[in-house]
Each structure stands twice: as structure tokens, then as C-alpha cells.
Amino acid sequence: MKQYLDLMKHILAEGVDKSDRTGTGTRSVFGYQMRFDLSKGFPLVSTKKCHMRSIIHELLWFLKGETNVAYLRENKVSIWDEWADDNGDLGPVYGAQWRSWPTQSGDAIDQISQVIAQIKSQPDSRRLIVSAWNVGELDKMALAPCHAFFQFYVADGKLSCQLYQRSCDVFLGLPFNIASYALLTMMVAQQCDLALGDFVWTGGDTHLYSNHMEQTALQLSREPMPLPTMTILRRPESIFDYQFDDFELTNYAPHPHIKAPVAV
């Protein structure tokens, strides 16, 4: 994906060196946007191999409303292990906020069910938003939400989605985030009988960690391959009934995987 490589080049050329919470150090830019036409292929980075299995299982885990890593571990996905406590708990992270945002009255709001109902009944609404940034519960979360909120947009029978990501690890995290929200958009579009529009990614503090520079240079030396195709093989009754085997990725011919340390 040229857009992703262009972002890396932009950070290297225009970014500033900053300290960060992890003590690793970053090169950072503030405010950046990329747009992907989902009708032209699935936006999965090809200049290194991405683990689509982890991306799918993490998204299904979010949609289940779960915040314990047990489901992920059962499916050999370890991307949240560094932040989990001894019992595998992460506090009220994405799944909790998406599916059961607590209200002052003691009720809970299922934002995913709500936004799908709104897309179907009020497609021109400007309030088709899901937020994970619950200020009242940030201190209970193992990690504050990086991909903080997203908005759907319906026009000409097509569904688009824009994600705002307040903090972005460009080398390790961003390929996952783009693919995850592109897939979520496909699922919601199917549930709402809409064609695919764009996925728009907007970043706040968008950075390369200082210990990812060699890996970034290697990735920039590689030529992007054509976009693969993601097919949803089945339409379940609801957004919450998808299974891992419902998704088929074809024509993905990436360059080899590049290892890099995670900043915790």
C-alpha cells in the first residue's frame, strides 16, 4: 500500500523526535489522513507479512464485548498479553465500551447494536459514531484506547467509515488497525445491505518508535504488491454472529515478515 509507505516517508522527513510514555522515544507527526476505496481491494500491508488471523480474532473479540484475553489465547493470539494482568484481564477496554458503555443511571449502552440500527433507520444521520474513549473509566483500563472513535457515513448506497486514532505505532500497530476497521466496515455494510465506500484513517500523534528505524528502512526498500481480496462467505443474522471461518483472504502475496519489539 503506497499510502502507508508515504506516511512512513513523511514521518522520517517531517517528524520531530519526542519522548513517550514507554521511554523508548519516537519520531512523530501530528495530524495525518489516508483514504482507502474498499471496492478496489482489501487494504492489507504487503511490504511485510501481516498476521490476518490475529486481526480477525481481535475484531471478533471486540464485538463479543470481552476484555479478558482468554478467547485470544485459545486462538493463539498473543497481541494483548503484555498488558493483561495475572488473570488475563485488561479492564474496561474496547469491547466493554463498544458493547456496554455504562450510564449514570446504571444501565449500559450497546453502541454497536445502536449504530447499526441507526444506519438502517437514519442513514443520513451525522451521529453514526462509536466511541471507546470513556473518560470516566480510563484509569481502570490497562491501556487507554489508541483507536478512540469511529464514524459511519452513508451516501449513494455506500457505507464509509472514518477512524480517529489518537496515538499510532505506525510500524507495528497501524497495519492491524487499517485492516481491522476495513473488515468491520465490510461486516456492517453487509448487515445493512449497503455497498462498500471508503475507509478513512485519521491519526493524531502518529509515530515511528526509535527502535523500529531499521525495520522501517527495510520495509521502504520493498515494492508494494497488488491489494488482496477479502470475501465474507456467509451473512449471519447479526453482526455478533460472525465466525473466523466466515472470512476468506485471497491473492495476498506479501514480502516476508519483519520482527520488531513492542513498546509497553
From Swiss-Prot:
The keyword Methyltransferase applies. It is found in: Cytoplasm. InterPro entries: Thymidate_synth/dCMP_Mease, Thymidate_synth/dCMP_Mease_dom, Thymidate_synth/dCMP_Mease_sf, Thymidylate_synthase, Thymidylate_synthase_AS. One of its GO terms (molecular function) is thymidylate synthase activity. It comes from the Bacteria. DUMP binds at residues 21, 126-127, 166-169, 177, 207-209. (6R)-5,10-methylene-5,6,7,8-tetrahydrofolate binds at residues 51, 169, 263. Catalyzes the reductive methylation of 2'-deoxyuridine-5'-monophosphate (dUMP) to 2'-deoxythymidine-5'-monophosphate (dTMP) while utilizing 5,10-methylenetetrahydrofolate (mTHF) as the methyl donor and reductant in the reaction, yielding dihydrofolate (DHF) as a by-product. This enzymatic reaction provides an intracellular de novo source of dTMP, an essential precursor for DNA biosynthesis. Pathway: Pyrimidine metabolism; dTTP biosynthesis. Its EC number is 2.1.1.45. Pfam families: Thymidylat_synt. The lineage of its organism: Bacteria, Pseudomonadati, Pseudomonadota, Gammaproteobacteria, Alteromonadales. Its main location: cytoplasm. PROSITE patterns: THYMIDYLATE_SYNTHASE. Homodimer. GO terms for cellular component: cytosol. The active site is at residue 146. The keyword Methyltransferase applies. GO terms for biological process: dTMP biosynthetic process; dTTP biosynthetic process; methylation. The gene is thyA. Keywords: Cytoplasm, Methyltransferase, Nucleotide biosynthesis, Transferase. This is Thymidylate synthase. Transmembrane segments: none annotated. It catalyses: dUMP + (6R)-5,10-methylene-5,6,7,8-tetrahydrofolate = 7,8-dihydrofolate + dTMP. Belongs to the thymidylate synthase family. Bacterial-type ThyA subfamily.
